[in-house]
Each structure stands twice: as C-alpha cells, then as structure tokens.
Amino acid sequence: MKEISVFILMLSLIIGCNEYSTEISQEIGSVKEEPSDFFTQESESSENTEKLFDFSKESHSEWFLVNDDVMGGVSQAQIQRINQSVMSFSGRLSLKNNGGFSSVRSFLPESALASFDGLTFKIRGDGRLYSVLVTTQNPRISWQSEFETNEGWQIVTVPFDEMRMSVRGWKVENSPKIVGSKVTGIGFIISDKIQEPFNLEIDWIAAHEDSG
C-alpha cells in the first residue's frame, strides 16, 4: 500500500490540511484491516445474470440522492419515474462552495453480489461523463468506473476489478480491488464540473458473473 501512503502525503501538501489528510488515512486504513478476501474472489466457470433493479416495477422508490450539500455545495437533482418503466436522474451541477457533484444511490442486501463479477445496466444519457459506483459498509469510500453516454440507449458492462477506489471524491491510484461479497450499495454519480442541466435515464440494472 506504499502508493496510497504517498497519495495521502501529497494530498496533505496540496490542500494544506493535515487533519483532513489524517482522516482519509484512517479510512483507507480501515480497508487495509479487512480480511484478505475483501480484495480477491474466485469466479465459478458458469454464466449467471441477475436483475437487481427493474424500474417498470417502481423500484425507483428505493433510491435516494447524495449531493454536494453534504460539504456545503448547492448542486440540485431529482429522481423521477417516467413512462412507467425508467428512472430519471436529473439536475444541475454548481461549483459554488467547492461543490460540483450529484449522485443517486440505493442499498443492497449484504452479500447479494457475492457470486457476481460486475454490473450491467441499460442507460440513456446526454453526452456527459458519469460513473457507476459501489460502496461497502463505509459509505465514504466507494469504487467507481466512468462511462460515456449519448442520446441513445446503451448497455454498459463494468467488471468489479475495473473499478477504482475513491475516498470522498479523491481517486486513489493503484488501489485495492473490490469484490461482490463486500458490496452493500450501488449508485451513479456525475462530477464533470459542467454547470449545465444533466439527465441520465436508467432502464434496468443487473449483476453478472463472467463465464469461463
């Protein structure tokens, strides 16, 4: 974890806040103390897919917003169900008060993704860059993977081993990998610093297990 220690030191020098750097260090340390299976998981040689959210069944009510107001920002967002089948995550980012992100999230039962290797979802966007994220029991630490959108429907597949750790928005290079057995939350986040309206429509979300 030498790279993470270097990252923490550089962060402290850049923002001039030793207290904040120490707090992030403690949170990353809590991950280091997890059992080794937190970072490694063997896959069975069979294909398996399980639908997690189908928004034709009103499961949008299980989702909630986490915006930059948690740190004083003023970005705005909303969740809607449209056409009785799609969840719309829309709003407008603002960079005021060092803000600039908005996210929509939901919880998952513990170990619900234990036998899976990643996520697959059907979305339609607006040409902007979003990230899919997963969280563990420490919601301040997430694992994220960016994906581009366009105005047409897309099916995106993201393996867990391609996700990278983020601590309160700070990306951690050479971070440990996340595995499905530790995932307790899922979400989407936009943080491209563009102060214009955004809209991401989500049809369904599934967990997948690689075959082979």
Cite the ranges covered by each PLM segment:
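Beta-rich carbohydrate-recognition modules and glycan-binding surfaces
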Residues: 17-212
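Bacterial N-terminal signal peptides
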Residues: 7-14
